From Swiss-Prot:
It is found in: Cytoplasm. Pfam families: LIAS_N, Radical_SAM. Pathway: Protein modification; protein lipoylation via endogenous pathway; protein N(6)-(lipoyl)lysine from octanoyl-[acyl-carrier-protein]: step 2/2. Belongs to the radical SAM superfamily. Lipoyl synthase family. Residues 49-265 form the Radical SAM core domain. [4Fe-4S] cluster 2 binds at C63, C67, C70. Its EC number is 2.8.1.8. This is Lipoyl synthase. It comes from the Bacteria. InterPro entries: Aldolase_TIM (IPR013785), Elp3/MiaA/NifB-like_rSAM (IPR006638), LIAS_N (IPR031691), Lipoyl_synth (IPR003698), rSAM (IPR007197). The lineage of its organism: Bacteria, Pseudomonadati, Pseudomonadota, Alphaproteobacteria, Rickettsiales. The keyword Iron-sulfur applies. It is an enzyme of class 2 (transferase). Its main location: cytoplasm.
Length: 296
């Protein structure tokens, strides 16, 4: 049996050590912004921050959910910061970002789940950086009537909401969420605003079966999702769900091939793939693939 306490060589990454990495870190700190890169202990932080790519986490640093895979703090959430959208827009401008990814903690305590705050962030970025494309990675807005409409009207270039895992694992891995609610949210955004690219991602290595992963692909295509990401689950701490399997690079290539046969415009599948990993480059490929589909 494989030693799951030791990560395989294909998972290992270099420790961050570049000047640009520290410059990005200082800017984020000085503007009092949170990033999912830090809070979720992302393995790609060194590479991304060295390129001045960062995923800002809005709506505070404390989540109202306690998913078994996630390293973000859970508990009583922070007060909403009305100046956060302006500081975020300033960071985008100072980093000279061509493409920005914005995510958030879950805010079940807010009437709209934080949807209007996302909309304000998009609006502020559009004012100061009109040529920057905007990708948002949102919570599921469970039982938040009108949230999808607020998001669709804000017109992000990409709407991302992750299903995270297969439905059979939701009770243990994502107990506060509902699989079919996530599918419904993705479908509703596309229905409300067909010109917004939709995206979703999932982790593997949590104990799912291959046929379950393929079924999720089919469900996402039924919801008109354009872009699928698949990455290896990594246990943040001993208090989180254990890794059931380290999926090999060859198995990821197989999943990518299968996903492409389903009709996704874009598929990214590898051990280190995360929702916002190479998001700027992937967005360009996504647009190119869409244009090719139009003329084919």
């Amino acid at each position: 049996m494989a030693n799951l306490n030791k990560r395989p060589d294909w998972i290992k990454v270099k420790a961050p050590n570049s000047t640009e990495y520290y410059n990005t870190k200082d800017l984020i700190k000085n503007l009092r912004l949170n990033t999912v890169c830090e809070e979720a202990a992302c393995p790609n932080i060194g590479e991304c921050w060295s390129k001045k790519h960062t995923t800002v986490m809005i709506l505070g640093s404390v989540c109202t959910r306690a998913c078994r895979f996630c390293n973000v703090k859970t508990g009583r959430p922070d007060l909403l910061d009305p100046h956060e959208p302006q500081r975020l827009a300033e960071a985008v401008q100072k980093l000279n970002l061509k493409h920005v990814v914005i995510t958030s903690v879950d805010r079940d305590d807010l009437e709209d789940g934080g949807a209007s705050h996302f909309a304000e962030c998009i609006s502020e970025i559009r004012k100061s950086s009109p040529n920057t494309t905007i990708e948002i990675l949102t919570p599921d807005f469970l039982r938040k009537e009108g949230a999808a409409e607020i998001i669709a009207n804000a017109k992000p270039d990409v709407f991302n909401h992750n299903v995270e895992t297969v439905p059979s694992l939701y009770k243990t891995i994502r107990p506060g969420a509902r699989y079919y609610n996530s599918l419904s949210l993705l479908h509703n955004i596309k229905k409300l605003s067909p010109d917004i690219f939709t995206k979703s991602g999932m982790m593997v290595g949590l104990g799912e079966e291959i046929n379950e992963v393929v079924q999720v692909m089919d469900d996402l295509r039924e919801a008109k999702v354009d872009f699928l990401t698949i990455g290896q689950y990594l246990q943040p701490t001993k208090n989180h769900a254990e890794v059931a399997k380290y999926v090999t690079p060859e198995e990821f290539k197989y999943l990518e091939r299968v996903a492409k046969t389903k009709g996704f415009l874009m598929v990214s599948a590898s051990p280190l793939t995360r929702s916002s990993y190479h998001a700027d480059e992937d967005f360009q490929k996504l647009k190119e693939n869409y244009q090719q589909k139009l003329v084919s």
